[in-house]
């Protein structure tokens, strides 16, 4: 069925912003995956990085896996958030503007800057703490001397905490945006019922 030419399709600018950021974050994790695979292919004659990481999951290497998994969860969360903004702006016809727009910007920045930085820092901390970064930087020459260093992880606690706080602030701002949009629509619905 073809829509009439004079109809206008409603769109959500906030849903578009969150979907675009999810696509960008997806490109980042794809690049990171290709980078890991390329490094493994280059160093395959000297060490099997994937095998080493899977055998040393108890130590700092788990930060690599957790950061990677959390990054993928973050991408899905950003894309899912777009559905909520679309519902508010298109279905409920609640334009996000004014104070709610400021909250939505904090939400977008908090999720993308705070969330992405937390997960990427966790991945980097795992690479450094597990000793894999040393192998990569030396071209795979010191595979015999590979030893995890848990003490190096202490320097990542404060940056991870700061960016986790930015993420939480963004999520709280997003929750407030959702709540204000929903309650505003409820008031409008109650006014229509009272007028009828």
Where are these regions (language model features)?
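Glycine-centered secondary-structure boundary/capping sites
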Residues: 1, 89-96
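Cytosolic juxtamembrane amphipathic/interface segments immediately preceding
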Residues: 2-12
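Intrinsically disordered terminal tails
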Residues: 1, 195-196
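Membrane-interface helix-boundary motifs at transmembrane edges
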Residues: 11, 94-101
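Hydrophobic cores of alpha-helical transmembrane segments in multi-pass integral membrane proteins
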Residues: 15-92, 102-188, 192-195
């Amino acid at each position: 069925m073809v829509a009439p030419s004079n109809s206008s399709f409603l769109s959500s600018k906030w849903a578009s912003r969150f979907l675009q950021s999810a696509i960008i974050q997806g490109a980042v994790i794809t690049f990171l995956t290709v980078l890991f695979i390329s490094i493994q292919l280059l160093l395959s004659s000297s060490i099997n990085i994937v095998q080493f990481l899977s055998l040393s999951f108890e130590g700092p290497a788990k930060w690599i896996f957790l950061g990677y998994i959390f990054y993928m969860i973050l991408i899905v969360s950003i894309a899912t958030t777009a559905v909520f903004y679309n519902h508010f702006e298109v279905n409920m016809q609640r334009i996000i503007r004014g104070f709610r727009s400021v909250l939505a910007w904090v939400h977008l920045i908090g999720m993308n800057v705070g969330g992405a930085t937390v997960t990427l820092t966790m991945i980097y901390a795992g690479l450094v703490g597990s000793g894999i970064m040393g192998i990569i930087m030396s071209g795979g020459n010191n595979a015999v001397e590979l030893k995890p260093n848990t003490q190096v992880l202490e320097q990542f606690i404060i940056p991870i905490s700061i960016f986790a706080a930015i993420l939480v602030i963004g999520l709280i701002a997003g929750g407030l945006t959702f709540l204000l949009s929903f309650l505003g629509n409820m008031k409008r619905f109650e006014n229509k019922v009272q007028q009828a």
